[in-house]
């Protein structure tokens, strides 16, 4: 990265807006929640500051270290937070940045032309929510140090504690304040996935993750010189591309927004490739933040594909005027794409930054991608024909499946439209209703008898669930079990899926605790992920946890849910005589047992299905359920030891 910039990063770059007191009162407003997700968000805030420094052209390496007792350390080799006295606070700029909300370089467009933070409050918020917060700044050949306690109270002003002529940058250590935050463990998988994503999105920056916690002791490094091209390559590792090339382009521009009298800088990168799959794997980002609801950058990208491929299809006689247009949905089939824009003045729709709203981005992206794809088609006619043929095939498949789709999208509350095998609940109150998807008629019969009919519905699956990863839309929507699921849930399928129409608040998958049951679970989850993604995204999908064993002793029964729990019980009761029954299937339990162990809200355990990284989940579903055997074997070998529940 270039370290010789004409602009100076000093106290003059730091703008001060307001104090910190609100953060401890309402932490959810600043980091989303106080649970495990909030704990991880605190890490992201500090890492994002370091990445912003790299994006501004200073430094090459960001290192995260987890230590025992919840201590987190983030270090970079950027310029270091300014250490001079700030004119408005009469304190060091380091202390100003870390104790005053909205005081940060992100508010000075000369300092950071593009950054992830909409408000620039990250470091001070983390300080406010930490019991201990320590900062070392290597700058101007000196080592500066300041320490805060109990939500941002400085122990003493910034001091010089040594010299170092070879090193520059910032090192921060913090421990969350568990009088505010809930005490969860840091999840190394979630952290590693996010850091790897940052490495893909910021080519040439090295990321290091050291987990030094007791019993962990791992080190991972990421450096992707190919950036988002390598991201697409990674996502397609278990897929079969129909063209060998990854289409890639980037462009930087400055535009003036007349209504705001403001000049903005935009840097766009796009990389995409078509595969022989049936699903859309498009992921968009603005300033490294995943915009999972899309926005103007995605709209511009799709508009460009729509314009160029439809024009090419007509010119080369792949379709006639009477066939109609290839839709944007058709063009998304088998597409893997990364759209990454860096913007100096991003405008998001909603507090969570999940949709980009800048109107100037739409035209900029459309223009760049149109020019890129048009040139690619001109220079690569064979690949252009394959891409177009894929889109045309998707169009005709869609048209053939429309009748099947229509029958699956009937009004959810018309009893005549509900499948005959569904034992529906009495209530029409979606907020309390539950749908149990049960494996087989035998278990379905016990579930129907044992349920609370008022709010629990039962849908037994008789046939084999289709692996939607390997099927086109026409085949999927002709499958009886799939049609039954769609009709029972009542909300349609992507892209018209509507959460407002779901008939049940909880969709609970209840299968046997064996290999076949696990296979049915993953088939159902694949369908929900590909065709009803908001169900998972908004937390409506659950996995029931039926017992593995029944221990009978002293004229009483105890239900046990794992081998580890069984061993624990044996160790605690070494002299007790008992009988042990292992449940091979749900059908071995009568209705009373099934209610007591698996369906009674007062006693049952449900696992909520959640997704932290949609792109990574996409890759995993493709790997596990796709055609490629070798990557699937590698994945299983790599992850087998970390699986807590597996039945061979």
UniProtKB/Swiss-Prot annotation:
The keyword Electron transport does not apply. One of its GO terms (cellular component) is cytoplasm. Mg(2+) 1 binds at residues 439, 512. It catalyses: ATP-dependent breakage, passage and rejoining of double-stranded DNA. Its main location: cytoplasm. InterPro entries: DNA_gyrase_B_C, GyrB, HATPase_C_sf, Ribosomal_Su5_D2-typ_SF, Ribsml_uS5_D2-typ_fold_subgr, Topo_IIA, Topo_IIA-like_dom_sf, Topo_IIA_B. CDD domains: HATPase_GyrB-like (cd16928), TopoII_Trans_DNA_gyrase (cd00822), TOPRIM_TopoIIA_GyrB (cd03366). GO terms for molecular function: ATP binding; DNA binding; DNA negative supercoiling activity; metal ion binding. Mg(2+) 2 binds at residues 512, 514. The record marks 464, 467 as: Interaction with DNA. It is found in: Cytoplasm. Few gyrases are as efficient as E.coli at forming negative supercoils. Not all organisms have 2 type II topoisomerases; in organisms with a single type II topoisomerase this enzyme also has to decatenate newly replicated chromosomes. A type II topoisomerase that negatively supercoils closed circular double-stranded (ds) DNA in an ATP-dependent manner to modulate DNA topology and maintain chromosomes in an underwound state. Negative supercoiling favors strand separation, and DNA replication, transcription, recombination and repair, all of which involve strand separation. Also able to catalyze the interconversion of other topological isomers of dsDNA rings, including catenanes and knotted rings. Type II topoisomerases break and join 2 DNA strands simultaneously in an ATP-dependent manner. Heterotetramer, composed of two GyrA and two GyrB chains. In the heterotetramer, GyrA contains the active site tyrosine that forms a transient covalent intermediate with DNA, while GyrB binds cofactors and catalyzes ATP hydrolysis. This is DNA gyrase subunit B. It comes from Mycoplasmoides gallisepticum (strain R(low / passage 15 / clone 2)) (Mycoplasma gallisepticum).
């Amino acid at each position: 990265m270039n370290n010789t910039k004409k602009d100076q990063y000093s106290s003059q770059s730091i703008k001060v807006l307001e104090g910190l007191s609100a953060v401890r009162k309402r932490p959810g407003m600043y980091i989303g929640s106080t649970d495990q997700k909030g704990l991880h968000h605190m890490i992201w805030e500090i890492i994002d500051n370091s990445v912003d420094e790299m994006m501004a052209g200073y430094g090459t390496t960001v290192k995260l270290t987890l230590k025992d007792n919840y201590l987190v350390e983030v270090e970079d080799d950027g310029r270091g937070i300014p250490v001079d006295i700030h004119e408005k606070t009469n304190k060091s700029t380091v202390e100003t940045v870390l104790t005053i909300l909205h005081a940060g370089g992100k508010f000075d467009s000369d300092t950071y032309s593009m950054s992830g933070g909409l408000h620039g409050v990250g470091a001070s918020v983390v300080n406010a929510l930490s019991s201990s917060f320590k900062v070392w700044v290597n700058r101007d050949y000196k080592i500066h140090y300041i320490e805060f306690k109990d939500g941002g109270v400085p122990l003493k002003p910034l001091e010089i504690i040594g010299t170092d002529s070879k090193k520059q940058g910032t090192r921060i250590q913090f421990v969350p304040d568990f009088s505010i935050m809930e005490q969860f463990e840091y999840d190394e998988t979630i952290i590693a996935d996010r850091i790897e994503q940052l490495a893909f999105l910021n080519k040439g920056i090295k990321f290091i993750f050291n987990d030094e916690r007791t019993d962990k002791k791992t080190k991972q490094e990421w450096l992707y010189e190919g950036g988002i091209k390598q991201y697409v390559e990674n996502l397609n590792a278990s897929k079969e591309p129909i063209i060998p090339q990854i289409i890639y382009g980037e462009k930087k521009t400055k535009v003036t927004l007349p209504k705001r009298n403001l000049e903005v800088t935009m840097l766009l990168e796009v990389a995409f490739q078509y595969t022989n799959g049936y699903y859309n794997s498009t992921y968009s980002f603005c300033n490294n933040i995943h915009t999972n609801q899309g926005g103007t950058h995605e709209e511009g990208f799709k508009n460009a594909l729509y314009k160029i491929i439809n024009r090419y299809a007509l010119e080369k006689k792949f379709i006639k005027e009477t066939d109609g247009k290839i839709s944007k949905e058709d063009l998304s089939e088998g597409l893997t794409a990364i759209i990454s824009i860096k913007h100096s003045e991003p405008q998001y729709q909603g507090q969570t930054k999940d949709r980009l709203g800048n109107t100037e981005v739409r035209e900029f992206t459309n223009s760049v991608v149109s020019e890129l794809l048009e040139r690619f088609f001109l220079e690569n006619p064979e690949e252009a024909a394959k891409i177009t043929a894929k889109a045309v095939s998707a169009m005709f498949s869609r048209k053939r499946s429309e009748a099947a789709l229509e029958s699956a999208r009937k009004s959810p509350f018309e009893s005549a439209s509900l499948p005959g095998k569904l034992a529906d609940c009495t209530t029409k109150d979606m907020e309390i209703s539950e749908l149990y998807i049960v494996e087989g008629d035998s278990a379905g019969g016990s579930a129907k008898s044992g349920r609370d009919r008022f709010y629990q519905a039962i849908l037994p699956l008789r046939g084999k669930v289709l692996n939607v990863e390997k099927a086109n839309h026409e085949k999927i929507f002709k499958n009886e079990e799939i049609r039954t699921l769609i009709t029972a849930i009542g909300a349609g399928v992507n892209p018209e899926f509507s959460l407002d129409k779901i008939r049940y608040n909880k969709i609970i998958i209840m299968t046997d605790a064996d290999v076949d049951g696990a296979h049915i679970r993953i088939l159902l989850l694949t369908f929900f992920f590909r065709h009803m993604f908001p169900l998972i995204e908004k937390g409506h999908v659950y996995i029931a946890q039926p017992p593995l064993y029944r221990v009978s002793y002293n004229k009483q029964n105890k239900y046990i849910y794992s081998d580890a729990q069984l061993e624990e019980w044996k160790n605690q009761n070494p002299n007790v005589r008992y009988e042990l029954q292992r449940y091979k299937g749900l059908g071995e339990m009568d209705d009373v047992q099934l209610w007591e162990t698996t369906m009674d809200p007062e006693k049952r355990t449900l696992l909520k299905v959640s997704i932290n990284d949609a792109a990574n989940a996409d890759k995993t579903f493709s790997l596990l359920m796709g055609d490629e055997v070798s990557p699937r074997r590698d994945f299983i070998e790599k992850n087998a030891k970390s699986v807590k529940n597996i039945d061979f």
